Design a protein with these regions (language model features):
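Interaction-prone helical segments in low-complexity regions
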Residues: 1-73, 91, 95, 170, ...
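Short terminal or interdomain "cap/linker" segment that borders an active site or interface and mediates
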Residues: 2, 90-94, 141-180
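Select subsegments of transmembrane alpha-helices in polytopic membrane proteins
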Residues: 23-31, 107-118
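Hydrophobic alpha-helical membrane-embedded segments
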Residues: 67-83, 144-152
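Membrane-helix interface/capping segments
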Residues: 78-100
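Short membrane-interface loop/juxtamembrane segments of multi-pass integral membrane proteins
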Residues: 92-116
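Alpha-helical transmembrane segments and their membrane-interface junctions
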Residues: 115-136
């Protein structure tokens, strides 16, 4: 690799410092799917909520739009990642920012993507509470798992974006600091 395509060690260190906490947030949000599953299992055993399908029959048709919203959330994760991490868009948004501010912006954007990935499992939990359809919860939890897989914060992807930004905004990388 040439000097222009490689990120120096100080920038990689700073990138790791940003990605570490992001991955903790990612793990916690993915872990929330398990927490919701435990809640559903406990409620099933206790038998208090939901009241049953007969009470939900009048609005049973709502299941399908909520499934569609779960699928839309997966698509939104893909679109958001592409738009928020598009190198040209990052370069435009980097106007007037230094490297730590840029990394903070990217980090905040990544958390937004995670939040969208959690939408399907929350919809599934709501459907289970209202109608008692366990399958609804499982399907929508599965969609959340897919959305989270699509949202994983890849160090390689972040490096590629920063290399591209460095090409057009080298002043951001002039003195990154040695300790991050």
């Amino acid at each position: 690799m040439t000097q222009s395509t490689m990120l120096d060690e100080a920038i990689r260190h700073r990138l790791r410092a940003v990605l570490g906490p992001l991955r903790v947030v990612y793990g916690a949000m993915v872990g929330s799917i398990l927490v919701y599953w435990i809640v559903v299992q406990v409620i099933r055993k206790v038998g208090q909520i939901p009241r049953g399908r007969d009470a939900f029959a009048a609005v049973d048709w709502l299941r399908y739009p909520l499934y569609a919203l779960g699928l839309v959330a997966c698509v939104v994760v893909l679109v958001l990642r592409r738009r928020l991490f598009d190198p040209e868009a990052v370069i435009r948004r980097a106007q007037g920012q230094n490297l730590p501010e840029l990394l903070s912006t990217l980090s905040s954007n990544q958390v937004l993507v995670f939040a969208v990935g959690e939408v399907p499992v929350i919809l599934g939990l709501a459907l289970y509470f209202v109608g008692g359809y366990l399958l609804d919860f499982y399907i929508l939890a599965g969609l959340s798992a897919v959305a989270f897989a699509l949202a994983f914060p890849s160090a390689v992807e972040w490096e590629q974006v920063l290399i591209r930004v460095r090409t057009f905004r080298p002043e951001l990388f002039a003195h990154p600091g040695s300790s991050g």
